[in-house]
Amino acid sequence: MAGTIAEENADRATFETDQGVGVPVALGEGLDWYAGKPNRISSVVHRDEAQLNPGQNSRTLAMIEAVMSAAPSMGQKTALVLKDNAGVALPEAPWLLGAQGPAILEVWFPGQEDGNIVADLLFGKVNPSGKAPVTFPIAGRSFLDALAPEAYPGVLEEGKAAVSYLEGRYMGYRWYDGNRGGGCALQPNGENPCVAFPFGHGLSYTMFSLTPFAQRWENGVLKLETTVTNRGDREGAEVVQVYFGLSEPGQPPKRLVAFQRVALAPGEARLVTLSLDPEASHHPFDVFDDVTKAFRPAAGPIKVYLGTSSSLRDLRAQSLLAREE
């Protein structure tokens, strides 16, 4: 199945008559971008969204669920195209996430070439190779409001709405890695139960494999090497990502320090080398000292992660090779 439903027509086409693809049901949270209070990604699951958005419930999730429930094989024939400006909280539902759900294509706000871009991706003229620059969390689990109302959704200060950035160093994917809101302890396979799609995640119409990586120091610069192989029958690109885990107290479990995109023909293999210079401007080996207000070398051992997303499921880990003097 291929097609689009304009947002302004979604309610009418789907819910005004019994001949549509569904009937009115209570909407979940997260994908309802055009309601009066959009994108409610909260640790509290809002069962009655109509109370939050009286008369403006776009029923986006209910529409998707109705379409996906039309036939057992619908998930293999449906693509959900997201056009938005940020990560979206997704409900933990088999009709949306997993093998029975649709293919999900995040195109952000593509501009005037919207139609051409989406068509080229859906019909395979272009092979997707992007990686998520944000976390797509599961709705109702350990969002920032678990920290304090001042962090999310904000409070009134002198009559004006104000949000305080209380998460400190645990911004973005680090928040979920560090389980700062509770309830997000990693599963045995490395997956985070609060995350639908992790930072750095992105699929393709082909498949890639990475060999175990090697480390070496060269002229004071750390070199990480892995061989990436395109094991599918389509040309495509993978993004190799490197994270450092610092053992110093107060630091997130890991942070992105390097990445490199590699485009490969079907069956092609290529050695990829990522360089990490201790003197680089993003200070990969350092921490910021709140007392001295300056960067300094991190105390304790460093763990090196290399893979294809921020999820431990997609990473290999090694202890940092001692620097040659």
Q: Where would I find each of the regions flagged by the language model?
A:
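C-terminal non-catalytic regions of proteins with extracellular/luminal or membrane-system context
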Residues: M1-E325
